[in-house]
Amino acid sequence: FPYQGSSTILESGNVNDYEVVYPRKVTALPKGAVQQKYEDAMQYEFKVNGEPVVLHLEKNKGLFSKDYSEIHYSPDGRRITTHPLVEDHCYYRGHIRNDADSTASISACNGLKGHFKLRGETYLIEPMKISNSEAHAVYKYENVEKEDEAHKMCGVTQNWESYEPIKKASQLIVSTEFQRYMEIVIVVDHSMYTKYKGDSDKIKAWVYEMINTISESYRYLYIDIIVSALEMWSEKDLINVETSAENTLKSFGEWRAKDLIHRISHDNAQLLTATDFDGPTIGLAYVASMCDPKRSVGVVQDHSSVNHLVAITLAHEIAHNLGVHHDKSSCSCGSGYTCIMSPVINSEVIKYFSDCSYIQCREYISKENPPCILNKPLRTDTVSTPVSGNELLEAGKDYD
C-alpha cells in the first residue's frame, strides 16, 4: 500500500479502513483540440491494494436538457429562474481498463468523487481534506461507520407476491425502439435547503452526483434520465411537508399538477426532503404512474451522508412510477448483490436492477406506452438550428 489509514472523517462519515492514493491524469489531448475545463474523456492512474489501475471516464453528456433551469425564491417570495450553462460539467461514467465487468460513476469537479467497481468489489473514492494535496481516500462502503443500523424501507406496501412476469428476461427482444427518455425535475424542500445551510452549490453538487449515479443504473432498463430543472424551496415550503410520506406525496403530486407542470417541461418530479418520515420509511412513490400529472412523482428522504445510498432510494422510487414492484427473493441482479428494488435498504452499495425489474419495466412500457417519455430531448451539447417538418419535436412537444 502507498499508505494505509486506520480512521478518518470523510464526507461519507467516519471511515475505519482506507487507502490513500494520488490519481494521476494520463489523458493526452489531440493536437489542436480546444481545451475544455472538463474533457469529454479522461484517464487516471492510481493504485488499489497496491495494484495499478487505469480509470477511463467519459462525460455523461445526456445529463442535462438543453433548456435546463434552476429555480430559487427571494425573501419576498418571488420566483427566480436561471438557465446556467451546464455543457462543460464535471460528471462522468466509465470503467476500469482490462476489467470487462467494471463500472464507474465519478464527479471530477474538485478531485475525483464517486464509486467504481473493480473485480466485483465496489470502492468509493473522494478527495481528502488536506490543503494543497492531491491525496484521495479509496475505501469499501463496509468500512464506513454506520450512523444508524435500523432498517430503512420504501413505503410502497402493496403486496406484489402474486405478480409473475409474463416472459423471462431472455425472451424479451430489445431494440432501439425500446429506448425511452425521462426528463426529471428535482425539488429540494426547505428542510433540505436548511440542512445544507443554504449552500446552493453544495446542494447542486449533491443532486447532480445522485443523478449521475442513477443514470448509470437506468441504462440497463434502456431509459435515459435527463435533468430538466432543479428547484430549491429556499425561503419556505410550497406544500405542507409532513412526517407522513403518504400525505407529503399526495400534496407534492397535487402541487406538480397545479403549478410545476405549467412552467417546466418535464415527465417526472421527485421531492428531496430532510424531514424524517414516520417509521422506517425513507421514500414513497405511486406505482405505474409515469406521465400522469398528479401521480408521476415520488418523495425521498435525504437519509444518509453517503450520496450513493440516497441516489439508490431515488432510483427505487422512480422505478415504481415506471411500473416496477419490489423484488421477491427469486429476483436476481448477480450473485451476492442486493438489487435496487429490494424493499429494505441495507448498508451496502447497490447498483443494479434485477431481472424482475427489467421485465416489469419493459412490460409496463410496452403495455401502457407512457407517451411523455417517447421523445428524445435536445442535449446540452447539441447545437439546434431551425428545421422544416417534424425533425425538432422538442419545440412543440406536448408534455404529460
Swiss-Prot record:
The active site is at 317. Disulfide bonds join 291-372, 331-356, 333-339. InterPro entries: MetalloPept_cat_dom_sf, Peptidase_M12B, Peptidase_M12B_N, Reprolysin_adamalysin. Ca(2+) 1 binds at residues 183, 267, 372, 375. It comes from Deinagkistrodon acutus (Hundred-pace snake). Binds 1 zinc ion per subunit. Expressed by the venom gland. This is Snake venom metalloproteinase H2. Keywords: Calcium, Disulfide bond, Hemostasis impairing toxin, Hydrolase, Metal-binding, Metalloprotease, Protease, Secreted, Signal, Toxin, Zinc, Zymogen. Belongs to the venom metalloproteinase (M12B) family. P-I subfamily. Residues 1-6 form the signal peptide.
